[in-house]
Amino acid sequence: MVTLRKRTLKVLTFLVLFIFLTSFFLNYSHTMVATTWFPKQMVLELSENLKRLIKHRPCTCTHCIGQRKLSAWFDERFNQTMQPLLTAQNALLEDDTYRWWLRLQREKKPNNLNDTIKELFRVVPGNVDPMLEKRSVGCRRCAVVGNSGNLRESSYGPEIDSHDFVLRMNKAPTAGFEADVGTKTTHHLVYPESFRELGDNVSMILVPFKTIDLEWVVSAITTGTISHTYIPVPAKIRVKQDKILIYHPAFIKYVFDNWLQGHGRYPSTGILSVIFSMHVCDEVDLYGFGADSKGNWHHYWENNPSAGAFRKTGVHDADFESNVTATLASINKIRIFKGR
């Protein structure tokens, strides 16, 4: 009798589990695509759904960026469905996004964007989103390292290097400043005019502000024919093709609309890095943002503390961007390390 009860319990448990999983996957599939009742197609769909389930499992950090209903201000701005990287599957821009993007640097007679993107993905892998494919840890900790002079004598280097991802931007040298800025870089955000040579294992994230930026990256790893945009740019770069990622133009507009509320002409690389990291990381720490303790705005590699022309260009609203990051820190979505 006891054996029969155990067997019955096992059968019931199996049936409940089977019904639950079947219901879950069918409902999930229905939200994505219409279900096709061919065995091979079903297996593929179940496999893809299982991958998505694993990728998007709950964060295990103490404070998880994506957690909602903790701040109305944050919930109004953060859109988890936005895709930060351009791929062959999501490359079609809506008309209003395309028109807005074209105005950023007022490019004269740009080439056809669709043709440019097709050529881009003949050279750069564009069939998957590498950042999301790598999402295999319960708590991904990321350091976003800005270029502020407040990093000098901060001794943040080892702390920065302890993160899973370390994002840097533009010129950002590390040689000679290792104790303060660290040695590790996993992703480096650049545009053609700010490019610097990267380490072999560093992923380059190109931030395109105009069509020629996309053409440049193709040229720079193939023919080397583009050596000038509005200023001279490197004709050739040494970056592995599978290490080249493209920041999505629609994501730039999302940052501008949702987070900057239209302040400035367009977002700085700094705030683009911050919001990008919030969408691919579970925990984000900022280093090298803002002025130093004396109120000076300068780069950590500059010997002139009073420098800060980059803040006075009128292109970016540095004060508003600073307020955004300060607010994010105040509601425990990110942490800011202010250095010296």
Swiss-Prot record:
What is the name attached to this protein's record? CMP-N-acetylneuraminate-beta-galactosamide-alpha-2,3-sialyltransferase 1
Q: Which residues are glycosylated?
A: 79, 114, 201, 323
What is the recorded phenotype of mutating residue 230 to A?
Answer: Decreases the catalytic efficiency for the donor and acceptor substrates by 2.5- and 35-fold, respectively
Name the UniProt key words of this record, in alphabetical order. Answer: Disulfide bond, Glycoprotein, Glycosyltransferase, Golgi apparatus, Lipid metabolism, Membrane, Secreted, Signal-anchor, Transferase, Transmembrane, Transmembrane helix
Residue spans, topological domain Lumenal: 35-340
Which residue ranges traverse the bilayer? 14-34
> For side Cytoplasmic, which residue ranges?
1-13
Q: Which cysteines are joined by disulfide bonds?
A: 59-64, 61-139, 142-281
Which pathway is it part of?
Protein modification; protein glycosylation; Glycolipid biosynthesis
Catalyses which reaction(s): a beta-D-galactosyl-(1->3)-N-acetyl-alpha-D-galactosaminyl derivative + CMP-N-acetyl-beta-neuraminate = an N-acetyl-alpha-neuraminyl-(2->3)-beta-D-galactosyl-(1->3)-N-acetyl-alpha-D-galactosaminyl derivative + CMP + H(+); a ganglioside GM1 + CMP-N-acetyl-beta-neuraminate = a ganglioside GD1a + CMP + H(+); a ganglioside GM1 (d18:1(4E)) + CMP-N-acetyl-beta-neuraminate = a ganglioside GD1a (d18:1(4E)) + CMP + H(+); ganglioside GM1 (d18:1(4E)/18:0) + CMP-N-acetyl-beta-neuraminate = ganglioside GD1a (18:1(4E)/18:0) + CMP + H(+)
Please state where this protein is localized: Golgi apparatus, Golgi stack membrane; Golgi apparatus, trans-Golgi network membrane; Secreted
Reported effect of changing residue 148 to A?
A: Decreases the affinity for the donor and acceptor substrates by 4.5- and 4-fold, respectively. Almost no change in specific activity
Q: Which family does it belong to?
A: Belongs to the glycosyltransferase 29 family.
Upon changing residue 147 to S, the result is: Decreases the affinity and the specific activity for both donor and acceptor substrates. Decreases the catalytic efficiency for the donor and acceptor substrates by 17- and 32-fold, respectively
Functionally, this protein is described as follows:
A beta-galactoside alpha2->3 sialyltransferase involved in terminal sialylation of glycoproteins and glycolipids. Catalyzes the transfer of sialic acid (N-acetyl-neuraminic acid; Neu5Ac) from the nucleotide sugar donor CMP-Neu5Ac onto acceptor Galbeta-(1->3)-GalNAc-terminated glycoconjugates through an alpha2-3 linkage. Adds sialic acid to the core 1 O-glycan, Galbeta-(1->3)-GalNAc-O-Ser/Thr, which is a major structure of mucin-type O-glycans.
Q: What is its EC number?
A: 2.4.3.4, 2.4.3.2
List, in alphabetical order, the GO biological process terms annotated in this UniProt record. Answer: ganglioside biosynthetic process via lactosylceramide; keratan sulfate proteoglycan biosynthetic process; memory B cell differentiation; N-acetylneuraminate metabolic process; negative regulation of activated CD8-positive, alpha-beta T cell apoptotic process; O-glycan processing; protein glycosylation; protein modification process
Q: What does the UniProt PTM comment say about this protein?
A: The soluble form derives from the membrane form by proteolytic processing.
Q: How does it sit in the membrane?
A: Single-pass type II membrane protein
